[in-house]
Amino acid sequence: MDSGKEGEAPAATSSPESRRTRSNGKVKAFADAAPPSATVVSTKATPLPRGGWKKGVAILDFIIRLGAIGSALGAAAIMGNSEQILPFFTQFFQFHAQWDDFPMFQFFVFANGAAGGFLILSLPFSIVCIVRPYTVGPRLLLVILDILMMALVMAAASSAAAVVYLAHNGSQDANWIAICQQFTDFCQVTSEAVVASFVAAFLLICLIVVSSVALKRG
């Protein structure tokens, strides 16, 4: 019986070397294990998609463009229909006033008609700017042409306003008498046309400002 117990003792007892080997293996296993991935929390705000405000500006451009079309073509149509014939006349002279009797009014009709035609042709480019807010080429072209049309309409409205002023008030220094006391309807119609033309010029200025804002890099 003693010999059996002596034979089982070495199996139950582990040597210090084997314990060190097992402990070294555990340490190596922990060292070889991949460290847990650290969760990185970003404090940077997610950028919101830009371009929505540019699309809104393009829609505003389209609406203003429609108003400018109505004002320019309305001014040309009103001035083109300005005519008055007084009910009295002499044997050699008939009192008649018409828009084409004045070169400034002729230029007025041409300028406002040309501006209205340009604004109609510019509508497709304005729609392209709505569909593609970041496009630069059509918007830059519209800015350049809007500036030219604004200068043309402003010149026509200013020259016509000078004639209308003289028709209402005359000029004592130049011995020009006022004719609006006789041609009341003619002066009223031409005054309305000049006001409509100045409205068109103001809307063209608004278009230039809106297009410049749309071209700004956000």
UniProtKB/Swiss-Prot annotation:
Pfam families: CASP_dom. Its main location: membrane. InterPro entries: CASP/CASPL (IPR006459), CASP_dom (IPR006702), CASPL (IPR044173). Residues 1-58, 128-139, 214-218 are cytoplasmic. It is found in: Cell membrane. One of its GO terms (cellular component) is Casparian strip. Signal peptide: none annotated. It is a multi-pass membrane protein. The keyword Transmembrane applies. PANTHER family: CASP-LIKE PROTEIN, CASP-LIKE PROTEIN 1U1. Belongs to the Casparian strip membrane proteins (CASP) family. Regulates membrane-cell wall junctions and localized cell wall deposition. Required for establishment of the Casparian strip membrane domain (CSD) and the subsequent formation of Casparian strips, a cell wall modification of the root endodermis that determines an apoplastic barrier between the intraorganismal apoplasm and the extraorganismal apoplasm and prevents lateral diffusion. This is Casparian strip membrane protein 5.
